Design a protein with these regions (language model features):
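Short, well-ordered alpha-helices that flank and scaffold nucleotide-derived cofactor binding pockets
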Residues: 55, 80, 84, 141, ...
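Short, glycine/charge-rich flexible loops or terminal/linker lids adjacent to PRPP-binding catalytic cores
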Residues: 75-124, 132-134
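Conserved acidic residues
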Residues: 63, 121, 151
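Short glycine-rich phosphate-binding loop at a beta-alpha junction
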Residues: 60-70
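A phosphate-binding catalytic loop at a beta-strand-loop-alpha-helix junction
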Residues: 130-139, 143
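Hydrophobic Val/Ile/Leu positions in short beta-strands of Rossmann-like dinucleotide-binding domains
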Residues: 67, 125-126
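Active-site-facing substrate-recognition patch
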Residues: 1-61, 203-209
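PRPP-dependent phosphoribosyltransferase catalytic core
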Residues: 2-9, 140-209
Length: 209
């Protein structure tokens, strides 16, 4: 049974919800599942997340927000926050919101009609969480391949301070979960102890085993 708990940690009105256990992602095994389903689906909570992230990008040119992990609602609110400030260099309001498509090899691709939103554009990558930096790195590579320039990587939670050579701005980080751990599946201490995996997790949520 996966039990989601709300930690006594908040940024503005944004709260941190987690489950403790032994979880497996595509790239690692982790001891916390970060639940951001409310922030991704509730407009009020998405706006709260956007308010926390927007100040980092008020003076950064942003043409497109690439929304990974189902964060398009947050991305839309973030665009609104960025263009809404008087100090913003994006005050013309022309920020596009784009979700990636993945091929059979889990590589990001952009169809011909979407490529103009990337090519020669300043792209901000928005993720639900950054645990190892693997997905962030691949996303930066994909944007570069299609001719775009990544101006930042941001997320609700990040276990790393940098990805693809740039700082990751997040609402919550490892200081809020000091015992958060991410392991290569070959070096997972839980597996070595014979502890069963509690759930498989990805950007859509978790599936208990």
């Amino acid at each position: 049974m996966i039990e989601i708990e709300e930690l006594p940690v908040k940024r503005g009105n944004v709260r941190l919800r987690v489950a403790r256990g032994h979880f497996a992602t595509n790239h690692s095994h982790i001891n916390y599942y970060i639940d951001i389903s409310h922030q991704k689906t509730r407009l009020s909570e998405a706006k709260d997340v956007a308010k926390q992230l927007a100040p980092y990008y008020n003076t950064v040119p942003v043409d497109t927000i690439l929304c990974l992990d189902g964060t398009a609602v947050i991305g839309t609110c973030l665009a609104e926050e960025i263009v809404g400030t008087r100090r913003s260099v994006n005050s013309n309001g022309a920020i596009s919101i784009l979700e990636p498509e993945y091929n059979a090899n889990s590589q990001i691709i952009f169809r011909d009609n979407a490529q103009p939103l990337i090519r020669n554009k300043h792209v901000l990558i928005l993720m639900a969480s950054v645990t190892t930096g693997f997905t962030a790195n691949r996303s930066v590579e994909a944007v570069g391949y299609y001719g775009g320039t990544v101006v930042g990587v941001c997320s609700l939670y990040s276990a790393v301070s940098e990805a693809a050579g740039m700082k990751v701005h997040s609402v919550f980080d490892v200081n809020d979960l000091p015992d958060y751990e991410s392991y290569d599946f070959r070096d997972c201490p839980f597996c070595k102890q014979g502890r069963r995996i509690d759930a498989l997790v990805n950007s859509f949520g978790y599936s208990a085993l």
